């Protein structure tokens, strides 16, 4: 952990089926900021970012985490919902809604996984050089279909 550290496990669509970002969606399985004791689990799409529909349904949640420990982050992806988990416990569900703009559910196409450790940015603020180097330790990754 460090000021300006932004480790993340997230997903983007393999192709631009619906047009440029954010029309194909983004799934943030885990984002952690600085020294916070929580993670962010969020969905982004044209529906949430451009149409500002962040509460119908809620597009994300925060969950307490022990950031110095190993944690198991999971996403179970179903045709009608995304189910986020932390250490085997369900933390957030993003459902597919009927009767709303079609951009609410771009999650009907293949996505790829990104695991990265970003430094700095508008959300996390500047990097404190005294906190370098930073790391995100990963013990294992499991994908199944």
Task: Specify the residue positions occupied by each region the protein language model found.
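GH16 jelly-roll
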Residues: 1-145
């Amino acid at each position: 952990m460090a000021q300006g550290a932004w480790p993340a496990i997230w997903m983007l669509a393999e192709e631009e089926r619906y047009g440029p970002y954010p029309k194909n969606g983004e799934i943030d399985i885990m984002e952690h900021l600085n020294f916070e004791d929580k993670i962010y689990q969020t969905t982004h799409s044209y529906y949430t970012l451009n149409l500002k529909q962040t509460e119908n349904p809620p597009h994300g949640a925060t969950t307490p985490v022990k950031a110095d420990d190993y944690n198991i982050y999971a996403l179970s992806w179903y045709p009608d919902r995304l189910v986020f988990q932390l250490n085997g416990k369900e933390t957030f569900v993003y459902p597919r809604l009927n009767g709303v703009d079609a951009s609410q559910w771009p999650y009907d196409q293949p996505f790829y996984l990104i695991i990265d450790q970003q430094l700095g940015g508008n959300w996390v603020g500047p990097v404190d050089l005294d906190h370098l180097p930073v790391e995100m330790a990963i013990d294992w990754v499991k994908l199944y279909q």
